[in-house]
């Protein structure tokens, strides 16, 4: 304010000298006007400085907002139907862990062991690969469960599922893709059935369908299955195998004997009953079907996890992958090979076998290139352009190079349910790799 400015001088008039008074008055007036102009100029400069400071502040805020908006950039979301490869949904390259379960009793110390944590750091690339395969499995089965309904052709269900896997896993030869044919076994057929080309089987309301499919990255396999039934009368049958599988997973661990897991599974499975069309059945574990260890490019790596008591005394070991799967049946609880074969797999330990048929040699080269020791089905051979191959395929089977896996069936008229997860016995904990929100 001007009244507070120290530049304004107040001088008393001199009465004796009128000229001096007049001169002094003019000087005082000039000084006063000059002071006012200086004050106005200073005030203007302050306002300019304030405006510039305000602009600078606004500019900084805008930059911060821009930076914040960049940080808040959302990750891509999966489409419906799914079409975006999972590698694009996780640009960091790190894929979600499965469900972590701590070891118990004598192995509880592993949870906090620095030495064991260091071992896990070395295995991180493998863990990440198999987690990527598991994430694909979760997203594909979520979609398939939402679209499957009575009246669909089994071939359409399988091809929709398999094509979705190919997209989401970024299929790339033997580096990434489908690990084995889509099993969609119905009712008394427990496993290893998929439609061959031309099959016209239609899914019915009263069917019990086991959807068993696999994904892999660099041969690291996720083997995971679930059962679909539209009629609620089958709910207890599905619950039996689901809870039995959870029990098997809970019991599994480093140094656990395989026979103990089987006994625990059977106890839970056979505690269930199911009423079908007015008749009550006790659910039975299928005694000649098992879970199994998994190796790179090897779906059955040598160890079997029984689902009844009285199995092997062999122990599970650190670092192993296992498919824990259970089958509950209203039939005899025993399967046999039946129906037309669709599943085949090159024997993992097959050495060089001389082949006489040129067509068999050609087919073997195709199998080596496209599947190696991963399982395949006739539809997959059709898809890559193979024709008139049945005689050559039989020759490869007869020579012991390729193993056929016909459908496995309980008694006709019975119903079988299945649930399965892949687990990893890490040095510090047990990871249920394929676990999802659904099961």
From Swiss-Prot:
It holds the Pfam family Peptidase_M24. Residues 24-40 have a biased composition (Basic and acidic residues). It is an enzyme of class 3 (hydrolase). It comes from the Eukaryota. One of its GO terms (biological process) is protein processing. A divalent metal cation 1 binds at residues 212, 223, 420. The keyword Cytoplasm applies. Its cofactor is Co(2+); Zn(2+); Mn(2+); Fe(2+). Its EC number is 3.4.11.18. Its main location: cytoplasm. Ubiquitous. Preferentially expressed in roots. Keywords: Aminopeptidase, Cytoplasm, Hydrolase, Metal-binding, Protease. Gene3D superfamilies: Creatinase/methionine aminopeptidase superfamily, Winged helix-like DNA-binding domain superfamily/Winged helix DNA-binding domain. Residues 41-51 have a biased composition (Acidic residues). It catalyses: Release of N-terminal amino acids, preferentially methionine, from peptides and arylamides. Substrate binds at residues 192, 300. InterPro entries: Creatinase/aminopeptidase-like, Met_Aminopeptidase_Type2, Pept_M24, Pept_M24_MAP, Pept_M24A_MAP2, Pept_M24A_MAP2_BS, WH-like_DNA-bd_sf, WH_DNA-bd_sf. One of its GO terms (molecular function) is initiator methionyl aminopeptidase activity. Residues 1-90 are annotated as: Disordered. CDD domains: MetAP2 (cd01088). Cotranslationally removes the N-terminal methionine from nascent proteins. The N-terminal methionine is often cleaved when the second residue in the primary sequence is small and uncharged (Met-Ala-, Cys, Gly, Pro, Ser, Thr, or Val). HAMAP family: MetAP_2_euk (MF_03175). This is Methionine aminopeptidase 2B. It comes from Arabidopsis thaliana (Mouse-ear cress).
